[in-house]
Amino acid sequence: MALTLRAVKSLLRFFVTTFLLAIGACAAEPPLRVGMELQFPPFEMRDEKGQPKGVSVDLAKALGAHLGRAVEIKNLPFDGLIPALKTGGIDLILSSMTATPERAGSIDFSDAYLKNGLCLLVSAKSDVKSAADLNRAGKVIAVKKGTTGHLYATQNCQQARVLVLDKETACVLEVAQGKADAFIYDQIGIFENWRRNQETTRPVLEPFREESWAIGLKKGNDDLRAKVNAFLAEFRKSGGFDKLADKWLVEQKAEFAKRGVPFVF
């Protein structure tokens, strides 16, 4: 039976209204722009096709699903993440970032999602056994610019020579070649770099300073911060972090247990 003109107009109004509502919903929920430096496996890295992958990438996608928003990964230098957040270039930082009082002065942090700590990658040629051996004349310490290891060395190792380098790989190379006594970095990073350089380095995996990683948010964005914290609590309760460890951190978890070091999750 043919539709009347009135019925046709009614249907058109319905479809137009539905379309406009859909457009409005999309506009109200833009992609969640997540900043990270894709140079820290297995947390932040790229696959063989150049696409982001790793623990932090999976965590970001789970957060996006919880919020009902698509996720857009923004690859930025680590020391450029906070400036990008403050200027609105990204919505949050999820990049193995330690929550420190210094950083909390310029950005807000979520609840901690991972316990970490500063450790050492030591040259096989060096007599350094712990952080207590670093602050001595003649010692050379490699640190990555903008990290908590950089901050620690600046504040506590004035007698040593501190090499501030832009790349993690450059710090590791200095140690592996015997040009630096030690590289100060987090547990997972130290483990990964020792695993690739076992003949020329040795790890000190027991943290000499406890730290926690958290998600960075723009100051005053309390609504998003509350949603992120709710997600983290639910994700932990549902076993999400255990699943991430089983997917990405099997060898690390086993090695930590072997050495009697508490695991990060």
List where the protein language model places each region:
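Ligand-binding clefts/hinges and TM-proximal coupling segments of bilobed small-molecule sensing domains
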Residues: 148-165, 203, 233-265
